[in-house]
Amino acid sequence: MSHRQAPSVHLRVSAGDVGGRRLDAPRGIRPTQSLVREAIYDIVGPLVADAVVIDLFAGSGALGIEALSRGAAEATFIDQDERAVRVIRRNLESLGLPERGRAVRADVGRWLRASPDEVGRASLVLLDPPYNDAVLEQTLALLDALVAHGASVVAEHAHRQPLPSLGRLRTVRERRYGDTAVSVLVVE
């Protein structure tokens, strides 16, 4: 009997320097739909040029790679799944972006607590945690304490999952795409 692995999911970068190029995604993840990725960058487009980006719960790295393609200076990708980190590194290499992107295997909460200076340098934080999971609230609470004034946080989440009340981060925009919501928060 053959034990073949299911094929990887394939995505495409929507726009920018590597627009139209293929990305691989690890099996078993829920990649951000291209419509939602495009909507995110329609909202935060002007913030991307020369941005320092952190992509949390990175999966395939599609959100952060899209930022690099659209002119971000650098991106750090955090995911606890070793398969995801390998796929992100492979995607960065195949797109000619390895010098601008760094993939780290780590629990997001632990990494945020251990890397306050790196989080403080970020001008754009992207997060797409598992839907309907307490990790969204926990991650936003950590980011509320760590991101610098002027930074933007973009959270993809289930539209039925309300965002928690936070101290410094305020929701300035929210859009819904089917069961998905995209919320943009900034430090006030």
Specify the residue positions occupied by each region the protein language model found.
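Class I S-adenosyl-L-methionine-dependent methyltransferase catalytic core
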Residues: M1-E188
